[in-house]
From Swiss-Prot:
Recorded family membership: Belongs to the class-II aminoacyl-tRNA synthetase family. HisZ subfamily.
Primary localisation category: cytoplasm
Protein's job: Required for the first step of histidine biosynthesis. May allow the feedback regulation of ATP phosphoribosyltransferase activity by histidine.
Keywords, alphabetical: Amino-acid biosynthesis, Cytoplasm, Histidine biosynthesis
InterPro entries: aa-tRNA-synth_II/BPL/LPL, HisRS-like_core, HisRS/HisZ, HisZ
Miscellaneous field: This function is generally fulfilled by the C-terminal part of HisG, which is missing in some bacteria such as this one.
GO molecular function, a single term: transferase activity
Protein name: ATP phosphoribosyltransferase regulatory subunit
Pathway note: Amino-acid biosynthesis; L-histidine biosynthesis; L-histidine from 5-phospho-alpha-D-ribose 1-diphosphate: step 1/9
The keyword Nucleotide-binding is annotated on this UniProt entry: no
Quaternary structure note: Heteromultimer composed of HisG and HisZ subunits.
């Protein structure tokens, strides 16, 4: 019966889960505002062009009564880009936010389609200062949420962008290549280089193995490529990691990390923990996003944290109170 069942990917939260996820969102939001971030709330419904020039299959679309195509927001960063371009907000500025975002996932994947997020955007500040502040506040937010074990993994969007631009693939070929990279399919990548040979052949064939301790990955990557733009991206990662040496005990890299959002242009990072299969925090630089809305390029970096995944990471350490077994914990 549709009266008592939920749409695909939607979930009720009860008792401890509802209380703790609320507390995580509240505490991180209060912390970020205390650190000088300006709170911003954006609408759940937007014109679909804010997020894409074409209809995306993983977005929730609907028509309003005037026939305008709208979308349930899949992320907040694009909305903030719209705000910067369409209002008189002065930069540099720093925003923090929390709220729901929506991604349509196939039913059999068992993933949530409604996600609770908290995040930040640092816009118009010197790049290196902004990167360090973003990563520092990400770490502090995870510590505040009492996540005991986690690790930062770094990459750089310019690496894959350089390869894709150089190869000039059609949309189907590009999607296939990214699928090979995302799945670390070495056979697929080898076969691809046999049909679309380029200066990146050695790098692409080895890409599924270019992950692990940062210095080892950097050293190996530099042996495989001599493209100036990619080498500059590797230098950028290394310089950031050197600046973070007193903040993060250990870092890893994955140069086959495919950015979750298309607007990333520079350093990207994800955070993984022991009890969560996917990254529960991700972010990066997106200096060119504002051009999409007719504004000038600005240095910008941000991150978003999946509150429900953080709850999953700390669940076993929480006191067993409020509610009974099987009641939505």
């Amino acid at each position: 019966m549709n009266k008592i069942t939920l749409p695909i990917g939607m979930h009720d939260k009860l008792f401890k889960r509802a209380r703790v996820t609320y507390e995580i969102e509240r505490d991180i939001s209060d912390f970020l505002m205390a650190q000088g971030f300006n709170r911003i709330d954006t609408p759940t419904l937007e014109h679909f062009e804010v997020f894409s020039d074409y209809v995306e299959p993983h977005h929730y679309h609907l028509f309003d009564k005037k026939g305008e195509l709208l979308v349930l927001r899949p992320d907040v960063t694009s909305q903030i880009g719209r705000v910067i371009a369409s209002t008189r907000v002065h930069t540099p500025t720093k925003f923090s936010y929390s709220g729901k975002v929506f991604h349509y996932q196939e039913e059999l994947r068992g993933l949530a389609n409604e996600l609770s997020q908290a995040g930040i955007e640092i816009i118009g500040y010197p790049a290196r200062k902004a990167v360090l502040e973003a990563i520092k506040t990400a770490k502090q937010s995870l510590d505040l949420a009492q996540v005991k074990s986690y690790q930062f993994e770094f990459s750089h969007a310019a690496i894959l962008q350089t390869i894709l631009e150089s190869l000039a693939l059609d949309s189907q070929e590009e999607a296939q290549l990214l699928d090979y990279i995302r799945k670390k399919n070495r056979t697929g990548l080898f076969e691809f280089t046999q049909t679309r040979s380029s200066e990146f052949d050695d790098f692409l064939q080895e890409l599924p193995y270019l992950f692990g301790p940062s210095q080892q990955v950097l050293a190996r990557a530099r042996e495989l490529v001599d493209n100036e733009r990619i080498l500059t991206a590797l230098d950028d990662i290394e310089q950031v990691l050197q600046s973070l040496s007193g903040l993060l005990d250990q870092t890893t890299m994955d140069l086959g990390q495919v950015a979750a959002m298309p607007y990333y242009t520079g350093l990207t990072f994800k955070v993984f923990g022991d009890r969560v299969p996917d990254a529960f925090l991700s972010g990066g630089r997106y200096d060119q996003l504002f051009k999409r809305f007719g504004a000038a390029e600005l240095t910008a970096i941000g991150w978003s944290l999946d509150i429900d995944s953080v709850y999953q990471a700390i669940h076993d350490d929480l006191p067993d109170e409020g509610g009974k077994e099987g009641d939505g914990r």
